[in-house]
């Protein structure tokens, strides 16, 4: 039986590819997709979800837009990475359908309520919508199997020296998620920076030759440009968000550890930092499964294999 999932995202090139991977995988049953502000403004990320589902001919999936700003802060976006539209590069179709007439939290709650079994929430943007859901619907916590997030890092940040972008945008929301008591799986920069897509991988995807694989290659063409900056030391572009879906499909590709994680919400230099108690120094019980390594070639092979679904 397919695993029911609810995807909360802020497309974003890597979010878009996570959607592609999830919907090409019969092991997963995508019940709904909600959008969060982050990689671009809330209006643009919602539109990008609709554009991607139109491309994939999955206009049957309920979609709703989420919070327009973080819980306690002003919104920061990553337009320097993802461009003016949030999905610059390919020519994507205009949305062929409309979002639900409700908020992201309302759609999430409805999805959980109606599911016969607990649902896995996959969150690849800031954690605002998920935190609002947890705070407003404590009665539904038991309907959440786990929360798989792309965010954080044990070491270096990518938005500040200490913080990864998704967590930095709304650290208060991330702290609510980590301390919720619900199992959390964290795909942070420690693993996503190893999940790099090289130019030759992009060409491999393009050569698959269907409309979706071509769009994915064109998304990566744009995404690779930002990551060519020598400061990163990358060979390719880290494909952050699809690591969450890949872990659900093939956990054997990833090395994980069980650790306690907290989020710094007030630090002068460390705001948004995920504090991972790697050496068990706090005495706190582990609250997260933290990804620390990935079989890069296996990850690329999985993407290539699933892109053939769209032939």
UniProtKB/Swiss-Prot annotation:
State the UniProt keywords alphabetically.
Glycosidase, Hydrolase
Q: Which Gene Ontology BP annotations are present?
A: nucleobase-containing small molecule interconversion; purine nucleoside catabolic process; pyrimidine nucleobase metabolic process
Q: Which regions span the lipid bilayer?
A: none
An example of a GO molecular function for this protein is:
purine nucleosidase activity
**InterPro entries linked to this entry:** I/U_nuclsd_hydro_CS (IPR015910), Inosine/uridine_hydrolase_dom (IPR001910), IUNH (IPR023186), Pyrim_hydro_RihA (IPR022975), Ribo_hydro-like (IPR036452)
Give the UniProt family note: Belongs to the IUNH family. RihA subfamily.
What the protein does? Hydrolyzes with equal efficiency cytidine or uridine to ribose and cytosine or uracil, respectively.
This one is known as: Pyrimidine-specific ribonucleoside hydrolase RihA
Q: Which organism is it from?
A: Escherichia coli O139:H28 (strain E24377A / ETEC)
């Amino acid at each position: 039986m397919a695993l029911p999932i609810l995807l909360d995202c802020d497309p974003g090139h890597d979010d878009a590819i996570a959607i592609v991977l999830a919907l090409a995988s019969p092991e997963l049953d995508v019940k709904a997709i909600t959008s969060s502000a982050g990689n671009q403004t809330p209006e643009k990320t919602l539109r990008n979800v609709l554009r991607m589902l139109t491309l994939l001919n999955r206009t049957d999936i309920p979609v709703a837009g989420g919070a327009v700003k973080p819980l306690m802060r002003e919104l920061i976006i990553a337009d320097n990475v993802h461009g003016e539209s949030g999905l610059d590069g390919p020519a994507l179709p205009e949305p062929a359908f409309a979002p639900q007439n409700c908020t992201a939290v309302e759609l999430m709650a409805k999805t959980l309520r109606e599911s016969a079994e607990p649902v896995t929430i996959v969150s690849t943007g800031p954690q605002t919508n998920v935190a609002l859901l947890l705070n407003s619907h404590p009665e539904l916590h038991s309907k959440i199997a786990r929360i798989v997030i792309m965010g954080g890092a044990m070491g270096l940040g990518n938005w500040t020296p200490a913080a990864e972008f998704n967590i930095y945008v709304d650290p208060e929301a991330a702290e609510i998620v980590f301390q919720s008591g619900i199992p959390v799986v964290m795909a942070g920069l420690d693993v996503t920076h190893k999940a790099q897509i090289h130019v030759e991988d992009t060409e491999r995807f393009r050569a698959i030759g269907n409309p979706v694989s071509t769009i994915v290659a064109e998304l990566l063409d744009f995404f690779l440009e930002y990551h060519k900056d020598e400061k990163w030391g990358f060979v390719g572009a880290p494909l952050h968000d699809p690591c969450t879906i890949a872990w659900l499909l093939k956990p054997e590709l990833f090395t994980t550890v069980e650790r306690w994680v907290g989020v710094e919400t007030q630090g002068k230099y460390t705001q948004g930092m995920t504090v991972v108690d790697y050496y068990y120094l706090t005495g706190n019980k582990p609250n997260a499964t933290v990804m620390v390594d990935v079989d890069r070639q296996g990850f690329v092979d999985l993407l290539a294999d699933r892109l053939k679904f769209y032939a």
